Design a protein with these regions (language model features):
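Conserved non-catalytic scaffold segment of RNase H-like nuclease domains
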Residues: 1-122
Length: 122
């Protein structure tokens, strides 16, 4: 009998943002990601591999958001922009199942950031 074992690779993801839209429309409108943190898990065990970046959102962080995560405008002023880190992030998560506690929030913001990288149509 040939038993094939396939390792299940998961990436646990968390983000921090400049805030969130409290009004009408999508939660990400008017806001950007300022931190991405990920850890790799294979077969439910941490591997020690991780991905972490602070990101310059090119806009100010809401005071309420600073109170939540403690990341200040001054701290992220010299950090890379999302476009500069996006390739490394994609390479890290490639082929894995991505898991997030508040997935709707994190995925909405990630989708928004990647949509901003797309060239505008004619």
């Amino acid at each position: 009998m040939n038993i094939v074992s396939s390792a299940k690779r998961q990436i646990i993801l968390d983000t921090e943002t400049t805030g969130m839209n409290q009004g009408v429309g999508a939660i990400y409108l008017g806001h950007r990601i300022i931190e991405i943190g990920c850890v790799e898990v294979i077969n439910r065990r941490l591997t020690g591999r991780h991905y972490h970046e602070y990101i310059n959102p090119q806009q100010l962080i809401d005071t309420e958001a600073i109170e939540v995560h403690g990341i200040t405008n001054e701290f992220i002023a010299d950090k890379p922009k999302f476009a500069e880190i996006s390739k490394g992030f994609i390479e890290f998560i490639d082929g894995a199942e991505v898991v997030a506690h508040n997935a709707n929030f994190d995925v909405s913001f990630m989708d928004h950031e990647f949509s901003l990288l797309q060239p505008s149509g004619p």
